[in-house]
Regions:
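Carbohydrate-active catalytic/glycan-binding domains of CAZyme proteins
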Residues: 19-334
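Bacterial N-terminal signal peptides
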Residues: 5-14
């Protein structure tokens, strides 16, 4: 009963309402720092996904842990050989600390212990088990020419992942899964098809195990790192188009309309935020929504990267993100 009361109270705070129904004088949540998080090992945190960990009662962030500070790595070897880092927050998402890396078991045909791990997405099934959809490159390479796969893994504790299975999709060169539960049942995955001019494709599943590819979802502009979520009566897709984030809106999660302009294309003023924003995640928390993204703060072509957060705003038709405004973060446990 106490736990339920706390969740309801947090929901009221997140929507900016007091218990009396009157508008609260201040937006709830602690102010997030800039940067929100830097990886203390390799200083290359990117591609965040934020999920509630009910086992520890804290929010966890999974991220690609690029080897930004490792000397002697030629060409793009530094973005290969990566593991998935984990950070956690005990204040509803405003401050984060490093936890370690995810224990991910991959078979030898997918690179085994030498595989490159990128851009996870994590969802929780109705039975309580967690499912990760991970981009896997079977080795460490100096170029972009090699196969990439989206691999499904499962876990009971969010730390240890096994039962790896490649998801059969349109081509053997795919990255960046975004998976959501559909209102009528089943699941939908969006991903980047690198062989089709880096268009965004999608696939459907009844059980998170067997997937049917449905073809191209959007293809007006090349992009990667799609994130799909439902908020304020619409479906939204945010993609990394390397000039900020492209935004699409849909009534049915099938037919998408592009929003003019890009989010986070103009550099911010905060520390490590004076660069375009890339590869996002979005957490919907009550009536509010928070976009997590990464930057290369030292400029284009540099390696170091940091995680940032901004609160989204919308009238139901257009998404907005004021990255220089103080982000008071309050993520409701889910």
């Amino acid at each position: 009963m106490v736990a339920r009361f706390l969740v309801v109270l947090l929901a009221l705070l997140a929507t900016g309402e007091a218990c009396s129904g009157e508008q609260a004088p201040h937006v709830a949540g602690a102010v997030a720092p800039k940067p929100l998080f830097r990886d203390p090992v390799h200083d290359g945190a990117a591609d965040p996904v934020v999920v509630w960990n009910p086992l520890v009662g804290r929010w966890w962030m999974f991220y690609t842990n690029r080897r930004a500070n490792v000397p002697g790595l030629a060409d793009i070897a530094w973005v290969h050989g990566t593991r998935i880092g984990i950070a956690e927050s005990d204040d509803m998402g405003a401050h984060w600390r490093y936890v370690g890396t995810a224990n991910i078991k991959l078979p030898e045909n997918l690179g085994g212990a030498d595989a490159t791990q990128w851009a996870p997405d994590v969802v929780r099934a109705p039975d309580g088990r967690f499912h990760m959809f991970l981009t896997v490159v079977p080795g460490v390479f100096n170029d972009w020419k090699h196969p990439r796969h989206i691999v499904h893994l499962s876990s009971s504790d969010l730390r240890n992942w096994d039962d790896a299975r490649e998801v059969p999709l349109a081509v053997p060169k795919v990255i960046d899964a975004s998976v959501v539960a559909l209102p009528g049942g089943g699941w939908r995955m969006w991903y980047n098809n690198e062989a089709d001019k880096k268009s965004i494709y999608f696939a459907d599943s009844e059980d998170l195990m067997k997937w049917a590819d449905r073809g191209r979802a959007i293809g007006d502009q090349a992009g990667e790192g799609p994130k799909v979520f439902r908020w304020k009566g619409s479906w939204w897709m945010v993609t990394d188009v390397w000039q900020g984030l492209g935004v699409y809106r849909s009534a049915d999660a099938l037919n998408w309309t592009r929003q003019p302009g890009n989010l986070l294309q103009e550099p911010g003023k905060g520390e490590d935020d004076r660069a375009i924003g890339g590869h996002p995640d979005v957490v919907v928390s009550g009536e509010r929504a928070f976009l997590f993204y990464f930057t290369h703060p030292d400029g284009k072509g540099t390696r170091r990267s940091s995680i940032q957060v901004v609160e989204l705003a919308s009238d139901g038709q257009v998404l907005r993100a004021e990255r220089d405004a103080a982000a008071r973060v309050m993520l409701i446990p889910q």
